[in-house]
């Protein structure tokens, strides 16, 4: 099958198509993980994006459902140097996702690194793609909006409330689902936490009706500035019970506290990002997947930075300056402590979430 990748600057990259015969548009990004292609493809945060893998060989250890981070592939397309194994090919076909192989992913990555993320089109076809078609494809890419103009979270958030581990709880959490990864739910459940997953646009009153011990705002795709409805809910919850966040959830908490976010040139996507705990000086290697970040020049009043990225000094964690009342606790991290895929250095943060919930639950009893 023929494959073509068209970039907004008119660059044409031809290769071998695999997966579904399809045409998709999206923001072209790169991921530096050496393994974890199943988790990456099924991560809802990749909605609206075409993923280029920097590691040259993909598909060499198959596909298992237990590795899924959602109910299927959420990325728009897949770009690899070499694809091996029929399972990855069939996996993409099952979810109608095109892929292209036999291309210079190093060239693509360096282009993104120098110019920033790029609007692009990926097409696969059993018929040769002609020069005349190229002109039309370039036009489609140029007319495609920037990802910050697309409201992606409603496409990946749950439509109804889902409860996990209801019978065996030490504490309970309402998880505001902006596109949550299953690994996050699993990390909470493994620690004896009941998780009530609710839609991204749930209101404060509905969330409190579940009598949770803390709230976790999840990861997800797109620009946090598009999610003012969720920001308002988070703002209204702060001071009522402990509030935590991961990735997009961290950005929403930043805005709710009065801070600002901005779009990174090419983002952080991979399992090898070093993060420093400002207070302790400890460094963790973390898994990350984000294209927006907290502006360190506008730290919200009454808040402080927790963690910084050692590669580019961007903000990786923020918290509300602690008060004696646990209900005022607010903290969030930009990286993914659950990994999925990646290192587990920061999974202790889920222990801290659960301990926070247990403590608040005990105080509520009085």
Curated annotation (Swiss-Prot):
Return the similarity comment.
Belongs to the CarA family.
Organism of origin is Methanococcus maripaludis (strain C7 / ATCC BAA-1331)
- Glutamine amidotransferase type-1 domain: residues covered: 172-363
Q: What is the protein name stated in its UniProt record?
A: Carbamoyl phosphate synthase small chain
Q: Pathway, per Swiss-Prot/TrEMBL?
A: Amino-acid biosynthesis; L-arginine biosynthesis; carbamoyl phosphate from bicarbonate: step 1/1; Pyrimidine metabolism; UMP biosynthesis via de novo pathway; (S)-dihydroorotate from bicarbonate: step 1/3
Keywords on record: Amino-acid biosynthesis, Arginine biosynthesis, ATP-binding, Glutamine amidotransferase, Ligase, Nucleotide-binding, Pyrimidine biosynthesis
Q: Name one GO molecular function term.
A: glutaminase activity
NCBIfam families referenced in this protein's UniProt entry, alphabetically: CPSaseIIsmall, PRK12838.1
Q: What does this protein do?
A: Small subunit of the glutamine-dependent carbamoyl phosphate synthetase (CPSase). CPSase catalyzes the formation of carbamoyl phosphate from the ammonia moiety of glutamine, carbonate, and phosphate donated by ATP, constituting the first step of 2 biosynthetic pathways, one leading to arginine and/or urea and the other to pyrimidine nucleotides. The small subunit (glutamine amidotransferase) binds and cleaves glutamine to supply the large subunit with the substrate ammonia.
């Amino acid at each position: 099958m023929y494959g073509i990748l068209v970039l907004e600057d008119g660059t044409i990259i031809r290769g071998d198509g695999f997966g579904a015969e399809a045409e998709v548009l999206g923001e072209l990004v790169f991921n530096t993980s050496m393994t974890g292609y199943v988790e990456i493809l099924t991560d809802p945060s990749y909605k609206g994006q075409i993923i280029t893998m920097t590691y040259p060989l993909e598909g060499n250890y198959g596909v298992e459902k237990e590795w899924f981070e959602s109910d299927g592939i959420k990325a728009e397309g897949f770009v690899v140097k070499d694809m091996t194994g029929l399972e990855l090919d069939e996996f993409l076909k099952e979810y109608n996702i095109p892929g292209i192989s036999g291309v210079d992913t190093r060239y693509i990555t360096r282009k993104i690194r120098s110019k920033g993320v790029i609007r692009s089109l990926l097409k696969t076809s059993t018929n040769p793609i002609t020069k005349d078609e190229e002109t039309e494809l370039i036009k489609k890419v140029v007319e495609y909006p920037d990802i910050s103009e697309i409201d992606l979270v409603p496409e990946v958030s749950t439509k109804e409330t889902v409860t996990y581990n209801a019978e065996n709880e030490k504490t309970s959490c309402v998880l505001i689902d902006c596109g949550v990864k299953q690994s996050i739910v699993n990390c909470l459940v493994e620690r004896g936490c009941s998780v009530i997953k609710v839609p991204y646009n749930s209101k404060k009153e509905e969330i409190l009706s579940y009598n949770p011990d803390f709230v976790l705002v999840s990861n997800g795709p797109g620009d946090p500035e598009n999610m003012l409805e969720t920001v308002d809910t988070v703002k209204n919850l702060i001071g009522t019970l402990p509030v935590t966040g991961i990735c997009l959830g961290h950005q929403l908490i930043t805005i709710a506290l009065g801070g600002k976010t901005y779009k990174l040139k090419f983002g952080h996507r991979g399992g090898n990002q070093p993060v420093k705990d400002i207070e302790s000086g400890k460094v963790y290697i973390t898994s990350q997947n984000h294209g927006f970040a907290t502006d360190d020049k506008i730290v919200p009043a009454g808040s402080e930075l927790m963690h910084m990225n050692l590669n580019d000094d961007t903000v990786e964690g923020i918290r509300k300056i602690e008060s004696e009342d646990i209900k005022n606790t607010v903290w969030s991290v930009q990286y993914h402590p659950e990994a999925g895929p990646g290192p587990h250095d920061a999974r202790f943060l889920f222990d801290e979430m659960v301990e926070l919930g247990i403590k608040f639950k005990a105080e509520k009893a009085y």
